[in-house]
């Protein structure tokens, strides 16, 4: 089976595990984009500890779930967004103004839309979570 979008597969695994009430999920295969996205989710309290296991086949992450995710998903296609356009995309993907985050890949790294607005930079939309 060919996996074309690893980030989408990882976020779907998290969503399904949360729906089943699991306490942890194993994400495999992995890459740096998945890791930095998970770090943003961890910083905002959506997931707990992230553990990397080197199995000799590219590794995997074991992510502790906290039961705080209602919906999570990758944004496809990955739209480029300017600093001033972030509010429009926030209204499109998030249920309310103060609920949830958009994950954005910027020239200064992967961060939430709140950090991008604070730093006044744009980037590429990767995912949403609330």
Curated annotation (Swiss-Prot):
Q: What are the GO cellular component annotations?
A: ribonucleoprotein complex; ribosome
What Gene3D superfamilies does its record include? 3.30.1370.30, 3.30.1490.10
Q: Which UniProt keywords apply?
A: Ribonucleoprotein, Ribosomal protein, RNA-binding, rRNA-binding
Gene Ontology MF term list:
rRNA binding; structural constituent of ribosome
Q: Which InterPro entries match?
A: Ribosomal_uS8, Ribosomal_uS8_CS, Ribosomal_uS8_sf
Note the SS bond partners: none
The protein's matches in Pfam families, at most eight in alphabetical order, are given as:
Ribosomal_S8 (PF00410)
Would you kindly state one Gene Ontology biological process term found in this protein's UniProt entry? Answer: translation
User: Could you say which protein family the record assigns here?
Assistant: Belongs to the universal ribosomal protein uS8 family.
What's the subunit arrangement here? Part of the 30S ribosomal subunit.
HAMAP family linked to this entry:
Ribosomal_uS8_A
The role this protein plays is: One of the primary rRNA binding proteins, it binds directly to 16S rRNA central domain where it helps coordinate assembly of the platform of the 30S subunit.
This protein's name: Small ribosomal subunit protein uS8
> Which organism is this entry from?
Pyrobaculum calidifontis (strain DSM 21063 / JCM 11548 / VA1)
Gene that encodes the chain: rps8
